[in-house]
Curated annotation (Swiss-Prot):
Recorded topology in the membrane: Peripheral membrane protein
Subunit structure: Monomer.
Gene3D superfamilies given in the database record: 3.30.300.20, P-loop containing nucleotide triphosphate hydrolases (3.40.50.300)
Record-level GO BP terms: ribosomal small subunit assembly
Source organism, top-level taxon: Bacteria
Annotated organism of origin: Streptococcus pyogenes serotype M1
SUPFAM superfamilies linked to this entry: P-loop containing nucleoside triphosphate hydrolases, Prokaryotic type KH domain (KH-domain type II)
Gene that encodes the chain: era
Region spans: G2: 37-41
PANTHER family the record matches: GTPASE ERA, GTPASE ERA, MITOCHONDRIAL
Name of the protein this chain belongs to: GTPase Era
Region: G3, residue numbers: 58-61
Length: 298
């Protein structure tokens, strides 16, 4: 008998949702950084064994939106509740329950689907603090299970996977066993470039960045995949930061991104990057759609 199911990963920004998904999949399919709101689109991770398939949906961190992009991200996250049989509600062990968590809990109660509380980053706290956290969240909602984990170190992740597989129902294999995500390579390439911008720049730059892959094709002469990507920002000052002195920052972004892209594609890559200014793109629906943030996602 083959079993399958869809599982959403929900939570505030920066709680470790993408780190968890990448650990389960055994490779990077969702970008990570220490900046809040790194994930902007829903990302599907397809975990398949001989007897079961779990389709994880990693969602943007739920926050109080201040831009049209923020609205898109939050609606994209909540729309996932209509698509899944189980929710992993992830919270950090080293932070107390806050208003953002309570807001999500109210939506989860209304959705009336099983919710597993996943307390991440247990490597950062004393066990007594963890018990307090569990009691506090239990006072707000009746969770199906509570599983403490460290997504970064992999602690207790197998326990969580077993819990999910034990509760799967008989179903189809929705995706081939060698497919790990539903996103096209172009999307993953653009995300890897954006990840390096997040890692290497500070202050207001990360939230104002989008990456568009203009072209991606194999060069028959060099046998390399030639990629042309444009980094979009909102202000000239941000463009200057990303390019850097004599182009040094842009070269560093390109070099680091190329390494990850080559690992993903299993091919040599020639990556060409450009920087363009598109004023206030985060508040313009047409620009959001052009840059891959489309309402069709929810």
């Amino acid at each position: 008998m083959f079993k399958s199911g869809f599982v959403a990963i929900l939570g505030r920004p920066n709680v470790g949702k993408s780190t968890f998904l990448n650990h389960v999949m055994g490779q990077k399919i969702a970008i990570m950084s220490d900046k809040a709101q790194t994930t902007r689109n829903k990302i599907m991770g397809i975990y398949t064994t001989e007897t079961e398939q779990i389709v994880f949906i990693d969602t943007p961190g739920i926050h109080k939106p201040k831009t049209a992009l923020g609205d898109f991200m939050v609606e994209s996250a909540y729309s996932t509740l209509r698509e899944v049989e189980t929710v992993l509600f992830m919270v950090p062990a080293d932070e107390k329950r806050g208003k953002g968590d309570d807001m999500i809990i109210e939506r989860l109660k209304a959705a009336k689907i099983p919710v597993i509380l996943v307390i991440n980053k247990i490597d950062k706290v004393h066990p007594d603090q963890l018990l307090e956290q569990i009691d506090d969240f239990h006072s707000q909602m009746d969770f199906k299970e509570v599983v403490p984990i460290s997504a970064l170190e992999g602690n207790n992740v197998p326990t969580l996977i077993k819990l999910l597989t034990d509760n799967l129902e008989e179903g189809f294999q929705y995706f081939p066993e060698d497919q790990i995500t539903d996103h096209p390579e172009r999307f993953l390439v653009s995300e890897m470039v954006r990840e390096k911008v997040l890692h290497l720049t500070q202050q207001e730059v990360p939230h104002s960045v989008a990456v568009v892959v203009e072209s991606m094709k194999r060069d028959e002469e060099t046998d390399k995949v030639h990629i042309r990507a444009t980094i979009m920002v909102e202000r000239d000052s941000q463009k200057g930061i990303i390019i850097g002195k004599q182009g040094a920052m842009l070269k560093k972004i390109g070099k680091m991104a190329r390494r990850d892209i080559e690992l993903m594609l299993g091919d040599k890559v020639y990556l060409e990057t450009w920087v363009k200014v598109k004023k206030n793109w985060r508040d313009k629906k047409l620009d959001l759609a052009d840059f891959g943030y489309n309402e069709k996602e929810y």
